[in-house]
Amino acid sequence: MSLASVAARRASSLRASTLVRTTFNRAIASASAGDALETVVGVEIHVRLQTRSKLFSGSASAYGGEPNSRVAPFDASLPGTLPVLNAGAVALAVKLGIALEGEVQLRSAFDRKHYWYADLPHGYQITQKRSPIVLGGVVRCQGNLSGDDAGDERSTDGALKVGIERVQLEMDTGKSSVAEDGRGTLVDLNRAGQALVEIVSEPDMRSGEEAVACVEALQRMLRYLHVSDANMEEGSLRCDVNVSVRTSEERARGVFGERVEIKNLNSLRSIARAVKYEAQRHAKVLAGGGKIERETRSFDVNTGKTVVLRTKENLLDYKFTPEPDLPSLVLTSADVEAIAGRMPELPNAAYERLVSGGASPSASNTIVAFPSTLKYFDVAMENCGAAKSADVANFIANEIIGAARKDAGATHKEPLSTLPRAASARRVGELLGKVADGTLSGRMAKQVLEALMNSDERALGDIVDDICGGGQISSDDHLRDICHSVVRDKPEEVRLLQGGKSKLMGALVGEVMKRTSGRANPKDVSKLLADIVAGEP
């Protein structure tokens, strides 16, 4: 090779290097000049399936228990043991794929993902890297997204859609913990081999809030399908997030920044905090002329910061290989159609049903959060007489679910799980029917509800008689007489009211309510008083 050609290649290399630096510097300058960086988020969610036994063994699959009390020989990787696929887990994965509007694969396969931890006795995890059971799909997030870190075009119409790349079956690992004396690691294999699905999203979210909305939507779907209880606090749903940032120029060109993975976020609040912190960290690094490195990080809930677990140089090489002890998983179209024919109403459909029936978006959102709360609403509606759907929804969302959550001290569990039998949906429906027909006022209904929440199981009529004196005064003549007496006893207030001091009407209504022990309907009282003050009999 001649010196001339070497010089030419050297010059070409320098030009390319200069171009890279220039492009990078433009991106930094753009960010520094006020061109806001866009946050890009994807999620990887591991969901424990509600199966009686584990994915590849007959050992019981349940949360908790004495350490190592639910371990089959295969779970402990004893020599000579082989995996036997749980058909129930397959059916749940198919059901989830249908709900996500994904493409259920009639032929999928299992792989070995090799790595070593003390709680992984096989030295590999059985998963579906090459050929997952579901490809594609979408999560439709209900509700209004708003806040400081909401995406621009996604924060007003509640129409966030997050694409799903894949859903794959895999087995869970055991659980490691540090011994009390700090001298060793304890391993509990109760969780080892439990059936999981991993749900991998597209990078379609633009904030921590949108990531939370996606996970919440998935939680609801999983619960309605009875695929999982999806309780993050018990590890039934574990979330990893991938975070990157990019300039408007990069967005226009359809390219993404270097991503960082944050592992094992175990609450919705942690997801939002971790994404927000990591996006800010990226922006700070880039503004200082640095470069984002691909790495895996964890989130410290105490400091609100992410911490490096593994750098790019130390990322694991899992050496995926086909699972030799399991044949391909083959389904038929009839299998998939049979499962599709048994699909329940999903939360988004339930939400639309409630809103179209007149319930507010806020109350509807609260009610459809759990299948049990939706069922409670439906049973109450069947027993509420002429009560409007909107009134029933608001009462249940605010007075019952709200009170139950306050008593439980948590919002992540089913709020009605500890509701007393006295406050059944049927009895609450009948109570609201009495409000609709004028027997009770809204205030009276709340007083009766308090008795029900305190496990008062007497007949509803007896409770109404005891607490509300039988309900609102139903005789117009009796109520008119009381209003006349108030007008006679308050001549100065009446004179001022007739002179235009309209606020005094409230004082007169209050006096009538006092004389009736709260049993009068304030609207009826106000109308009667207005007629009397105007000179009508």
Swiss-Prot record:
<dbReference type="GO" id="GO:0032543">
    <property type="term" value="P:mitochondrial translation"/>
</dbReference>
<dbReference type="GO" id="GO:0050567">
    <property type="term" value="F:glutaminyl-tRNA synthase (glutamine-hydrolyzing) activity"/>
</dbReference>
<keyword id="KW-0067">ATP-binding</keyword>
<dbReference type="Pfam" id="PF02637">
    <property type="entry name" value="GatB_Yqey"/>
</dbReference>
<protein>
    <recommendedName>
        <fullName>Glutamyl-tRNA(Gln) amidotransferase subunit B, chloroplastic/mitochondrial</fullName>
        <ecNumber>6.3.5.-</ecNumber>
    </recommendedName>
</protein>
<comment type="subunit">
    <text>Subunit of the heterotrimeric GatCAB amidotransferase (AdT) complex, composed of A, B and C subunits.</text>
</comment>
<keyword id="KW-0648">Protein biosynthesis</keyword>
<dbReference type="InterPro" id="IPR014746">
    <property type="entry name" value="Gln_synth/guanido_kin_cat_dom"/>
</dbReference>
<dbReference type="GO" id="GO:0005739">
    <property type="term" value="C:mitochondrion"/>
</dbReference>
<keyword id="KW-0150">Chloroplast</keyword>
<dbReference type="InterPro" id="IPR017958">
    <property type="entry name" value="Gln-tRNA_amidoTrfase_suB_CS"/>
</dbReference>
<comment type="similarity">
    <text>Belongs to the GatB/GatE family. GatB subfamily.</text>
</comment>
<keyword id="KW-0934">Plastid</keyword>
<dbReference type="GO" id="GO:0030956">
    <property type="term" value="C:glutamyl-tRNA(Gln) amidotransferase complex"/>
</dbReference>
<comment type="function">
    <text>Allows the formation of correctly charged Gln-tRNA(Gln) through the transamidation of misacylated Glu-tRNA(Gln) in chloroplasts and mitochondria. The reaction takes place in the presence of glutamine and ATP through an activated gamma-phospho-Glu-tRNA(Gln).</text>
</comment>
<dbReference type="GO" id="GO:0070681">
    <property type="term" value="P:glutaminyl-tRNAGln biosynthesis via transamidation"/>
</dbReference>
<dbReference type="InterPro" id="IPR004413">
    <property type="entry name" value="GatB"/>
</dbReference>
<dbReference type="InterPro" id="IPR018027">
    <property type="entry name" value="Asn/Gln_amidotransferase"/>
</dbReference>
<dbReference type="GO" id="GO:0009507">
    <property type="term" value="C:chloroplast"/>
</dbReference>
<keyword id="KW-0496">Mitochondrion</keyword>
<dbReference type="InterPro" id="IPR003789">
    <property type="entry name" value="Asn/Gln_tRNA_amidoTrase-B-like"/>
</dbReference>
<dbReference type="InterPro" id="IPR017959">
    <property type="entry name" value="Asn/Gln-tRNA_amidoTrfase_suB/E"/>
</dbReference>
<dbReference type="InterPro" id="IPR023168">
    <property type="entry name" value="GatB_Yqey_C_2"/>
</dbReference>
<dbReference type="Pfam" id="PF02934">
    <property type="entry name" value="GatB_N"/>
</dbReference>
<keyword id="KW-0547">Nucleotide-binding</keyword>
<keyword id="KW-0436">Ligase</keyword>
<dbReference type="InterPro" id="IPR006075">
    <property type="entry name" value="Asn/Gln-tRNA_Trfase_suB/E_cat"/>
</dbReference>
<dbReference type="GO" id="GO:0005524">
    <property type="term" value="F:ATP binding"/>
</dbReference>
